[in-house]
Amino acid sequence: MGERKGQNFYYPPDFNYKTHKSLNGYHGTHALRERAKKIDQGILVIRFEMPFNIWCLGCHNHVGMGVRYNAEKKKIGMYYTTPLHEFRMKCHLCDNYYVIRTDPKNFDYELVEGCSRQELRFDPTDIAQIGAVDRGFTQKLAADAMFKKEHEAEDKDKAATEEGRVDKLEWIQERMRDDFTANSFLRAQFRNEKKSLNETRARDANLRDKLSIGTTQLLPETEEDRRIASMMTRYRDTKTHDDHLESSRDRIESRRIFRRPEETDTPSTSSGSSGGAVPSASERLKATMKAERDKRINASFSTAGTSSATQKLLGIKRKSASSLGVQIKKAAPENSSLQDEEPAVEKPNISNPISLIAQEYGNSSDDSD
């Protein structure tokens, strides 16, 4: 359809080429539309970009370089064969208008009305830029030998100052002269960096899948992260004082109250294993089950006023006082005197009843085992 764009114009019956010239002339419009609303006055609306920093004289605000305005552009004269243009625009912060003209003689702009320049001018030679060529100075150097002699010393000093800079530029050019080698070296660096980035992305993706954290962005590792991770791995089994106390209580509670002296807390290992060998899974399970059973037994003994049903369940037999060899002394009458008091009966040398019960319970439990 591109070839038909120039043919899809409708020309009405009263259109006359000699009178209207074009469809825009027939409709009384311009090809630039709103930009040419003052074209009869020689004014064209353009987008003007501020060439330097200025101060608005109406609101005293700062307008930075590069700010763009809709400006009215018109031709006001000629400098030799170069036209002089004037730009008029409205401040975007107040009702003030700026008027700026071109100055081809000084390669600059002239601020006519509404604004003032922020003085930040530099000598082109100070900022490593080529300044404007003064043709009169060049012609005077060629025509006046004394004037040229006066400036030879300045040229020599400048050459000595810029010698190091010129050598550096030559070294850079020499280094980049073999473009194939430089390109190969640069591409090799890019390949290594790309490989490293792909490995990092794959490692991060595996970690995100393992932790189920979706598309969370992971930050790169740092030396501080590695140091903290090594400390966590090194001290992960370190326990506090409270942890040691709690483990000691658990070990004591899981220890049988009534046990033989040759029994130990640690589970026995297989006959073929050495003394420092790690117990197998079955041995650890047996030790855990035994510790839980001992805890239940100790808890039943620690409760006061054990019921008869619990005593029967544990295999405890209550013995009478006569069977233990204990003789109960009757109370003396109130009217008896201290001289008539009978001597105290010596208690038989027997072991503690609790030890007897424990011995009996231990024998019964060993038999059950």
Swiss-Prot record:
<dbReference type="GO" id="GO:0071014">
    <property type="term" value="C:post-mRNA release spliceosomal complex"/>
</dbReference>
<feature type="region of interest" description="Disordered">
    <location>
        <begin position="233"/>
        <end position="369"/>
    </location>
</feature>
<dbReference type="GO" id="GO:0005684">
    <property type="term" value="C:U2-type spliceosomal complex"/>
</dbReference>
<feature type="compositionally biased region" description="Low complexity">
    <location>
        <begin position="266"/>
        <end position="282"/>
    </location>
</feature>
<feature type="compositionally biased region" description="Basic and acidic residues">
    <location>
        <begin position="233"/>
        <end position="263"/>
    </location>
</feature>
<dbReference type="Pfam" id="PF04502">
    <property type="entry name" value="Saf4_Yju2"/>
</dbReference>
<dbReference type="GO" id="GO:0000398">
    <property type="term" value="P:mRNA splicing, via spliceosome"/>
</dbReference>
<dbReference type="GO" id="GO:0008380">
    <property type="term" value="P:RNA splicing"/>
</dbReference>
<protein>
    <recommendedName>
        <fullName>Coiled-coil domain-containing protein 130 homolog</fullName>
    </recommendedName>
</protein>
<feature type="compositionally biased region" description="Low complexity">
    <location>
        <begin position="299"/>
        <end position="310"/>
    </location>
</feature>
<feature type="compositionally biased region" description="Basic and acidic residues">
    <location>
        <begin position="283"/>
        <end position="297"/>
    </location>
</feature>
<dbReference type="InterPro" id="IPR007590">
    <property type="entry name" value="Saf4/Yju2"/>
</dbReference>
<comment type="similarity">
    <text>Belongs to the CWC16 family.</text>
</comment>
